[in-house]
């Protein structure tokens, strides 16, 4: 089955007209398909049209899969924009993750910020730690009514010489500064408020996430 994209009747008619003259069953546009025309899927990343589901740990492996999905869908939607002279739908990124690697998270942050197609993020159930970095940079950010988010400090462990520990503290200070800067830019929180919140491991419900600017809208049930 072929899925088409359109944003208005004019574009829909144009797609259907081209399809009617197609003698080989070639579809006008298909977004990111796997073997046999099935949607591309992995354990942590599923793709269906302009919807990407990210359910898993923020790891280097999973970030690579997610970043590839974002780039592929973005590229295909930009092809659609040029071919049909119509604005494509946004990329809808659904997130359910307890977090993971801050470096992997920032890699996806940069991919989202460089997408030409708007990326809308949705919190499905929960997003914590590095996963909130990803959700926070969406062009529009949604959270479902019973979902929660958690932001907190970095965690790190190491062993070595005294100087190694000094270097590690400098590294951690640098990364924490990056995290605070992102939250400062993408929320309603002051630097002082961010510093205090990061000291705790406290979940925020949908209403609190909206209040502090982690999201833009609550998706209500029904």
Which positions does each model-derived feature cover?
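Terminal-region recognition feature
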Residues: 1-222
């Amino acid at each position: 089955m072929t899925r088409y994209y359109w944003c208005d009747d004019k574009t829909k008619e144009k797609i259907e007209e081209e399809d009617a003259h197609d003698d080989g069953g070639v579809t006008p546009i298909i977004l990111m398909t796997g073997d046999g025309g099935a949607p591309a899927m992995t354990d942590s990343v599923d793709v269906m049209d302009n919807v990407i589901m990210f359910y898993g740990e923020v790891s280097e492996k999973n970030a690579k899969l997610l970043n590839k999905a974002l780039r592929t869908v973005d590229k295909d939607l930009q092809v659609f924009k040029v071919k049909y002279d119509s604005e494509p739908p946004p990329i809808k990124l659904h997130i359910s993750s307890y977090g993971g690697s801050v470096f992997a998270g920032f890699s996806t942050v940069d991919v989202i910020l460089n997408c030409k197609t708007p990326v809308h993020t949705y919190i499905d159930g929960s997003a914590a730690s590095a996963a909130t970095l990803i959700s926070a940079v969406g062009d529009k950010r949604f959270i479902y009514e019973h979902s929660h988010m958690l932001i907190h400090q970095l965690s790190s462990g190491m062993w070595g010489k005294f100087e190694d520990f000094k270097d590690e503290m400098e590294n951690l200070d640098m990364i924490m500064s990056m995290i605070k800067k992102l939250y400062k830019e993408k929320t309603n929180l002051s630097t002082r408020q961010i510093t205090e919140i990061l000291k705790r491991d406290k979940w925020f419900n949908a209403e609190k996430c909206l209040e502090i600017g982690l999201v833009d809208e609550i998706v209500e049930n029904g």
